[in-house]
Amino acid sequence: MKYNKFERKIAYLLTKFPGIKLAIKKMYQRVNYLRYKKSYTFKSDFTIKRIGKDSKESYFGYYDKSPINNTNEYIIFQSTNIDTKTMPEVKVPVDLVVYDVSNNNYEVVGQSYTYNWQQGTKLMWIDEYRFIYNDLDKSKRQYISKIYDVKIKEIKIVHFPIYDCSGD
């Protein structure tokens, strides 16, 4: 950062008085912040649009996955009536939602009993139109995963849970 001659001269004179120098420096920074701050608190070239229901809390899951499919047509996420500031409830499932971007259609396509607030159900796209998520087979008392195809609206059951998938 470059300082002008006046700023350097003042800084040199104040080296003998570190307490005063610190106070003046903070005041100078505050004045410059107020003088040059932007007139807005948030600026975006995009429109922000809510896609979940007002009465529910919605979330996707972990940061390493994208909720948007490769064709940018669909967004997947989990939705719940539970306050996500509290512990998940074992007997209460989360809804699995597919949002169709082209026609603004919000569709609950399933539910899952195996989730947490940080990673969700490990919901993730495995190709352009299919995603996978974890669930519980209550009759067999077994963790499973399910693959949902948004084009043919069909679910395939995999008899083990997943943590991650690759495109191979």
What are these regions (language model features)?
Residues 1-168:
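Sequence signature of WD/YWTD-type beta-propeller architectures
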